[in-house]
Structures are given as C-alpha cells and as structure tokens.
C-alpha cells in the first residue's frame, strides 16, 4: 500500500521493483531499480523535524527488504540503504541511519542511529545502536554493538559470510 501525506508527498517506486501488496510505504520513500519489498514490510518516512523538514528513506538498487521488516525515521532524519543490501525477516532499521552497499542484516536485527559500512554482515538477533561500523565488519549472532564497543574486538567478514549474504541478495532479486 502506497500512502501519501496531506502535503502530497508520496513514495516513488521504480517500475522494475516489486512491492508486495501487503507492504506499506509511507510518504518520502524512494525505491530504486530491482528492489524486492516482501510481505508486511513497513517503510515509513512520515515524521518531520522541528522545522517541518523530512528527509527521505532511500533504498538502493538490487536490494531486498524481506517479510515484516520495519524501516522508520525519527523526526525527519534520513535513512539510506545501499545497493545489493539484504535486510532479513522482522529486522528494524530506525533512522538516522546509513547502510553501505552489499550489506547483510539477519532476521530480528535492530539498527538505530548508526552508519554501517560497505560489505558488513550483521547476523541474526543482533543490535547495532549509536555507533559507526566500518566497512567489512562481521557482527556475530546475538551481539550488541554500541558506542561503548571496542571495534578492535569485532572480526572482519569471512569469505563464507560474504558469499552467504551475496547469495541471499541474488535469490531475492531473482523474484523481481
């Protein structure tokens, strides 16, 4: 379902992308080429800042937003999802947030007020809150990463983890 606000802002979805009929896209959402948005996903850019301004939620080409994912932006802040990025079932991305290209987020992952670099893998049931995760980092399942985390303790993405995330992206893009 595509929803607009009283000002007339409406989501923009590229013709080559697929949005499941049960998904909800609200207001300032931009969906680029060959994006898959699965059942019951909610992508909402419908809050304004103190000046009445609202940044968009941008989803990069060839990305997939799976079943039940919520992407939302606090007080008009931007959310940018890079190209070839996979966000698995029931994950939450809450802006302000920037996600690089080729990133994988496992199911039930929570991201809030963070920047996640290119090629990162954040496994299932993990939280990244209030920090910047450099390119190529690997967050194991059930970990909580925040401003208190010593990033020197975070491993780099392995070839297996990278291949898995790329395979998920390819599989879901085949659906578009």
Segments from the language model and where they lie:
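N-terminal segments that cap or nucleate solenoid repeat domains
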Residues: 1-40
